[in-house]
Amino acid sequence: MTKKLTSRLSKIANSKILIFSIYINIVACIIAALSLLYYWYRVINKNLSLWLMLLLLVIAGLAMYSIFINIKLMATAIEEILTENIDLEKYLDIYTLMYKKANRYSKEEQEASLIFTDGRVKYYRGQFQDVQLTFDALDYNKVQKKYRTKLLLRRYNFEMLSCILQKEREEYNRLKSEIETLSPSLPSDQELRDNILKITSVAYSIIVEKQPNNYFDDHSVNSRLGKITYTYYAALNAQLKGEEARTRELFESIAQENPELFYVREAKRYLKGEQ
């Protein structure tokens, strides 16, 4: 049910997504505030049963919890604009809209999110030379401490992949050395770093060293964008192994996707050249 809801939300206009999120939060805050105010008023008047007291507290708690769920729901819906709908323009636009509408307390953090999103979109569009320049504008002091490490790791991921696709060995090795020295405190961040190192290492092997590696054939991901990514690298791997029929089959499977993705343009270029 949650998956269907986030999928539907990701397909509506960006302004409506934000309005829906704000509306839900406002309603939940009002319910929580009224419940707590009534609870306080009746306690002062000493005319409230224990069960009613508990009920009001539960209502207030559920209202506050719904705000938390709504935030997570909106974050998932926004991410699906990119990973499932493959709508790069809309994805960048909603972060631009959130930045413009942010209040003075969240303006700086929304600016950092917008810069990172811009760099991410440029990567998927194949604008590899602009990726690092965009990320260089990031000010990590504007990001909440608990998110800084994850954001830094994800930046390394896109920068390293950009270097690989441009065959910039020296810069790739420099970035790899830097990320290897990081010691994330959270297990989830450690797992993310290890996964980035693994995937970039395999991509480097296939694209730069021209050495076949079956990682992308043997592993899978759930998102539509992730599947396109893995299929692209699996096709390059098949090409290295001289498996032209499989290479063609894999490239054909992604050639009808959004041509904004460099994966798709490269697939079409291969298929056109083959003809």
Segments (PLM) and residue ranges:
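"A position-specific structural signal for the A-helix of alpha-solenoid helical repeats
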Residues: 76-77, 110-120, 151-161, 192-204, ...
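N-terminal alpha-helical membrane-insertion module
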Residues: 1-92, 98
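Long, non-transmembrane cytosolic or organellar matrix-exposed soluble domains/tails
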Residues: 213-275
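N-terminal topogenic membrane-targeting module
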Residues: 60-143
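Alpha-helical repeat scaffolds
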Residues: 90-100, 128-140, 167-184, 208-223, ...
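A membrane-cytosol interface segment of integral membrane proteins
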Residues: 132-142, 146-169
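Residue signature of alpha-solenoid helical repeat architecture, marking inter-repeat boundaries
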Residues: 68, 72, 105-111, 146-153, ...
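Hydrophobic/aromatic side-chain positions at a characteristic register within alpha-helices
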Residues: 81-86, 123, 164-167, 205-207, ...
